[in-house]
């Protein structure tokens, strides 16, 4: 999408702010706002520690406290509607720019409800000296240059169109694996 946004923000905030109230019906805006603060603010810790905290939020929801006008209340704000997947908003962005230690542009980002869960790095098979290893090196470079994007990462994908592999931010290149089907066989990625 062509979106006017702050490049320092890796989230697709417009979508996130629209979807959270829809999948958390019955919760007041104060609870949603508190969850937004929590998922946008990570103080201290390594990238992996921040990613683990976000993964907990993604799986279990964000525990929040808010004032309802009479008393302090607590709630759990879900980031994804696992019960009704069609209530979630899926977006793929081509060339998503993030300004971290420097400005970088990831080839593709897969967003779920405005959360950048998948980073895809593509390399051209027509370039002789380029392969999937170069895509891995580029992903590692992004983790150093724009670490805020990878706080929210579920997994990364690298491809040179001859080979497509997926792995996590902690995986070495040898731990990135080819796509498999439900029965455990490998998908043809040609």
Each model region followed by its residue ranges:
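An alpha-helical interface "stripe"
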Residues: 1-190
């Amino acid at each position: 999408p062509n979106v006017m946004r702050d490049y320092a923000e890796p989230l697709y905030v417009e979508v996130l702010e629209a979807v959270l109230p829809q999948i958390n019906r019955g919760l007041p805006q104060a609870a949603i706002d508190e969850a937004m603060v929590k998922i946008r603010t990570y103080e201290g810790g390594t990238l992996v520690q921040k990613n683990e905290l976000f993964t907990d939020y993604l799986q279990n929801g964000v525990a929040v406290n808010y004032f309802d006008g009479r008393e302090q209340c607590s709630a759990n704000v879900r980031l994804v509607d696992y019960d009704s997947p069609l209530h979630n908003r899926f977006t793929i962005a081509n060339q998503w720019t993030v300004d971290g230690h420097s400005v970088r542009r990831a080839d593709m980002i897969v967003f779920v409800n405005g959360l950048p869960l998948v980073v895809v790095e593509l390399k051209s098979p027509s370039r002789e000296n380029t392969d999937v290893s170069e895509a891995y090196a580029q992903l590692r470079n992004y983790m150093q240059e724009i670490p805020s994007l990878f706080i929210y990462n579920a997994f990364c994908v690298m491809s040179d169109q001859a080979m497509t592999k997926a792995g996590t931010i902690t995986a070495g290149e040898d731990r990135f694996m080819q796509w498999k089907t439900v029965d455990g066989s490998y998908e043809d990625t040609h």
